[in-house]
């Protein structure tokens, strides 16, 4: 259809499609109900299929699919993908628990082999499966097509666009209940997700695989849910402003991590790149 689109044009069209799909899915919440967030998470992957099979037709060649980073597992990056989210979220909730705003409550039997196997399988496994739909779109397809901007700008822009893509679901549906002031919470979410995107993108570029980024994204969502489930507070609003994806502490920790990554990339600018074959 448009086989000679520049990478910048491909990135723009991809995001327009992905954003349009998530707005549509969000508006269909009265019909879709609890299926809405699950369908929403796969709209970026659907956008990739539309781009590669209909718009640019890159998907009719092996080289086209190779640019998504699906063919390498890169297991040696998986430890960092798990450890990074655990350290950040553990520190955030540890600080919250230490202030007395909230308290940790560990149910009996939580750390038995059976319970751990269940959490890892149905919890982390499902979270990663859902995150895959987003990561194939934003880190698999979009990020490589932004690399002509330079590594730092590409990482930040892919993270920012990913953050913006979340907003229709948050604003048009009750899927993500927000108790705080949106003028405060909205910018925090935007900046936190942008910073998290730097980490996902770093894993994608360093490993040349989308799977470490998928694992990191799934792990972050799962650890947020796990730590929130272990937390009891008399002030949900205070907790919302401090922890979770809407928390100031989460923003600070994530931004510091992103800052370290971007600083480390400065001397090696241009080395973390994905070179797309001509015409892809």
Report residues per predicted region.
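Aromatic-anchored segments of alpha-helical transmembrane domains
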Residues: 19-27, 86-94, 160-169, 218-230
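C-terminal membrane module of polytopic membrane proteins
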Residues: 57, 218-280
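Residue-level signature of the transmembrane alpha-helical core
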Residues: 19, 42-45, 82, 86, ...
